[in-house]
Amino acid sequence: MTASILEGFSIEVMPRTLAKIDNLEALLPPSTRVYLAHIEGVDFQDMLAAAARLTKAGYQVMPHFPARLMKDVSTLENWIQSYAGEAGISEALLLAGSPRAPQGTLSNSMQLLETGLFDKYH
């Protein structure tokens, strides 16, 4: 028997796309890994609400943590605390992000790790 790739897949969505879908459960099986894309111009509160909705629906949610969109380390800490406390998130995809120039003091994924905050809240 040949396994189908569609027996196991992940998907990436943005909050504005998710907001247009009333019955996500009809499209995605429970426990699907959903990467939540955080691009320039997306408000963190929209990200948080989308993450909470997805978690509540039983998906494995992994929000993006784009370093170049963060103002500073305290912003990173707020995101970690908010995602964990308000949306039940326990995983994250760390990346530099799409803006060429950082919008704050962080510019790459290694700097996010070097803060020690992911270990602190593990």
PLM region spans:
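Active-site beta->alpha loop and helix N-cap motifs at the rims of alpha/beta catalytic domains
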Residues: 1-122
